[in-house]
Structure formats: structure tokens, C-alpha cells
Amino acid sequence: MHQLTIAGKAYRSRLLVGTGKYKDFAETRAAIDASGAEIVTVAIRRTNIGQDASQPNLLDAIPPSKFTILPNTAGCYTADDAVRTLRLARELLDGHPLCKLEVLGDPTNLFPNMPETLKAAETLVKEGFQVMVYCADDPIQCKMLEEIGCVAVMPLASLIGSGMGIVNPWNLRLIIDNAKVPIIVDAGVGTASDAAIAMELGCDGVLMNTAIAHAKDPILMASAMKKGVEAGREAFLAGRMARKYYSADPSSPTSGLIGS
């Protein structure tokens, strides 16, 4: 299968994972290993990656030499906060430009604030960041983010942490069909079938955290998500049969029947 390419770098895995909500860093690493993910996103405002030398450092468990670290701006509600957070992340990661931008609008549902997201994206791209951006599943705004220069656009499947799966597949198809950068579903995936559906629609990848971390067995769920993403991608490439309503088509041959 073709590899996922983001900002000129190719990845074998199309599953991207988060690092929050696990019981400890050991479980985090075990789940990531089971998922096969190569890109791992980290909430800079909530996770220590060197800001506090007195606390355990996530990068000791998930070294940048093995994984692509994707700092994100979870918890930011303005463009200015998001930009400041990613400037700090770039310093902590020795100039690493790849980042995940998210600017939230409502703390009760974590839906993105799109005007602030667009504003932050413009600033970050001008400053040389390679921006992967969490956004609403609005085809027009997704195209605007692409045209600003974002290296990947990441529309939500449903609300962050909801586990509701793909609630608007038609918008996702519109976004995918019009895109010239990778489209990665971000947020709302609850189980492996959700991940498979996203990939069958033609998404280039899926990012998740809660679906794995809050499973009864996170390690097993991480493995299931890996398989779901792979199966969905293969099904997309294979091309599903056409739906035929009220038009029977026997799966067994109809010619050369015995006695005919």
C-alpha cells in the first residue's frame, strides 16, 4: 500500500495516536507499540517534555529518535495562546517544525473555534511551522486551511472524547474529494469499525486517543485500531462492489448448470 506522506516524510502507519489519559507512561508506551503508530501527539500544556526537570519526562518513554513527536495545543482557546504554545514546543524539541494546531471554542464540547484556528494557522505557517490542523468538518473552511499552507487537515468525526464515530460521512467525502493534502480524521472515533469506516471513505489516516486509553484493555484496543485502519485502507483501495437494490446477482455461476 502507498505510504502516508506528511510534509515530505513517509510513514508506514496511517494510525496516529495521543498520549493522554493513560495510567502511566509505561501503559502509554505499550499501547503505542501495539498500535504500530509512528506519529505520536503530545499536549504541551498538560504533558512534561522538558518544561519541568523535576518531573518524569514523556520523551524518556517515547523518544524522538523512534517516534515523530507531534506537539499539540490542546487546552488553547485563542490563536495567541496556540501560537505561544507551539513556539515553546519548537524550542523544547530543538526546532522541530511539525505541529498539531487546535483552538477550542467551547469547554463543554471542545468544538473548534474556526476563526481563531484560521488566524493561528496563518501565523504559524508564516513562521515556518508545518501545521496539521484540527478543524470542523466544513468543506469550505478545510479548503481555506489547505490554501493557507497547512500540511494536513484534520476534521473531526464527532466531538472529542465522544466515541460517536463518523456522524457526517458526506461532509468528509466532500473534504476528501477537494483536498490536495492528507485528510486525517481527528476526534470522535470509538472503536475499530469507526476507524475502518473513516479509511473506507478515503481518509488518509486517523488520529485517536480516548478510544484507546479509555478502553477496558487499552493495549488490545490499540491492536484492534491498527487492524481497523489497515482493513479500511485496503477496502478503499480495492473498491467496494456497487450497491444494488432489488437487483439480485447470484454469487454462483448461472451458466453450465447440471441438467440445463
Curated annotation (Swiss-Prot):
InterPro entries: Aldolase_TIM, Thiazole_synthase_ThiG, ThiG. GO terms for cellular component: cytoplasm. One of its GO terms (biological process) is thiamine diphosphate biosynthetic process. Keywords: Cytoplasm, Schiff base, Thiamine biosynthesis, Transferase. SUPFAM superfamilies: ThiG-like. It is found in: Cytoplasm. GO terms for molecular function: thiazole synthase activity. The active site is at 100 (schiff-base intermediate with dxp). It catalyses: [ThiS sulfur-carrier protein]-C-terminal-Gly-aminoethanethioate + 2-iminoacetate + 1-deoxy-D-xylulose 5-phosphate = [ThiS sulfur-carrier protein]-C-terminal Gly-Gly + 2-[(2R,5Z)-2-carboxy-4-methylthiazol-5(2H)-ylidene]ethyl phosphate + 2 H2O + H(+). It comes from the Bacteria. Catalyzes the rearrangement of 1-deoxy-D-xylulose 5-phosphate (DXP) to produce the thiazole phosphate moiety of thiamine. Sulfur is provided by the thiocarboxylate moiety of the carrier protein ThiS. In vitro, sulfur can be provided by H(2)S. Homotetramer. Forms heterodimers with either ThiH or ThiS. This is Thiazole synthase.
